[in-house]
Amino acid sequence: MQRSAGILLPVSSLPSPYGIGCFSQEAYDFVDWLKDAGQTYWQILPLGVTSYGDSPYQSFSAFAGNPYFISLDELVKEGVLTAEECKKAKFGRKADDIDYSQLYKERGRLLRLAYSRSDIGHNAEFAAFCEQNKWWLDDFALFMAVKDRFEGKPWIEWAEDIRLRWQNAMDYYRRELYFEVEYYKYLQFKFDQQWRALKAYANEKGIRIIGDIPIYVALDSADAWANPQMFQLDEDNIPTAVAGVPPDGFSPTGQLWGNPLYRWEKHRETGYQWWITRLWYCFELYDVVRIDHFRGFDEYFSIPYGSETAAPGHWEKGPGIELFRAVEQALGKREIIAEDLGYMSETVRQLVRDSGFPGMKVLEFAFDSRDTGSASDYLPHNYPVNSVAYTGTHDNETLVSWYQTITSAERALVRDYLCDYATPEAQLYKSMIALIFRSAATCIIPMQDWLGLDNSARINKPSTVGENWRWRLKKSQLTPKLQKEICSITTRYGRMNWA
């Protein structure tokens, strides 16, 4: 990756009058703002369909897009909704918060209304989209329609015939739920249209999109339901083991994610075709792809299904470099960022080196005794050119709140490293951002850190549910003053996007 800079901001966190950030004019305005701030990258979180915990890392599909991101204004322009209908909808009270329960009710109602008026069955572009994407779209749309029929229950709790995909049941539900299936295909068609238009606009402005994919699929996903042989499921399609990570300084019982683990021997037998296809599709949507939990390709933490915590888990070997050799042979060299944070064994480090992918460096980890990695790896003077540096990620505290929660001794270390004993604590985050801008690595800064916000703007606190993935940026926060500051530091340290 070239010497450059970017901003991390989930699509969901964009300003919007419709309850959640989406592919509306505000997204295009943000692209313009990034360009004028001298940025090269816009890093986002996964775009998948979110489920009960609202996490983009637990999606109903590895391929489908989140219909919440569909611009209602575009549907108004198409004549399938009216501006008054959108204005009357109640999406939530706060401009800086996402109320997912209201979104589910109101967005769902409006999207169904749009579908009912669309006459989509006579749309040649829709027919072509369905044909080109039937390899994932047919299973996904049927999965969602059947899920609605079973009142939202996970697929492992459905009736046996459709849970195990008996042919007579598949045929029955395709006939019985035809219009529901078409509705879910329609949503994916609109998502695809609007996202590709936004990405094309960003690329025209010299802004490259860094997408993000979780290593695992959710258990309650069309992927696991349609391809049970590729996962560690028993003869009744119930998991035998699930994913997570062991205890560390941030979580004494570890993290129990609950995702089904891959049956890697099956993937190897097919030449890793599922993964090749998945990554090929990602590069249709993004310019660069960050793969979450990269260490899971070297070793993955296997937790017996039904465990209450991650503590009973153990490490097992993953596919290693063989997978990425197969991907490169099929797709050529692609730009991938390896999320290699936390405790890294020597074999994981070797996998990252062998892959040639840039790893990640997080400034907060350099001074935080709770982190299980090597602190020296995260000191900016040690960042290699082939790395991407962050103040923090979506899983971390904001820089301002992090500095307040570390010990006084750790705060002293920060001051010593900065050689800065005079800057007021409330402004020290700017010095820390400048610190990684001086490093050799590509720099990606979360929007909250540029704004100097506290943990009320934190995106996610791992191992918790209920208050995550909710923060939204207010349009008034995208000021010319901030843009000028970002442009100035970007220029000063040779990271300016002159495109």
Feature-to-residue mapping (PLM):
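N-terminal regions that are enriched for targeting/export leaders
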Residues: 1-12, 28
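Alpha-amylase-like alpha-glycosidases and glucanotransferases acting on alpha-linked glucans and related
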Residues: 10, 16, 54-192, 217-444, ...
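Catalytic domains of carbohydrate-active enzymes, especially glycoside hydrolases
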Residues: 25-50, 285-286
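Surface-exposed amphipathic alpha-helices with a cationic face
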Residues: 35, 195-203, 328, 352-353
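Domain-scale activation on soluble regions of proteins
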Residues: 36, 162, 169-170, 471, ...
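Outer-envelope exported proteins of Gram-negative bacteria
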Residues: 45, 208-210, 214, 288, ...
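Conserved, well-ordered alpha-helix/loop/beta-strand core segments that scaffold catalytic motifs
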Residues: 184, 188-217
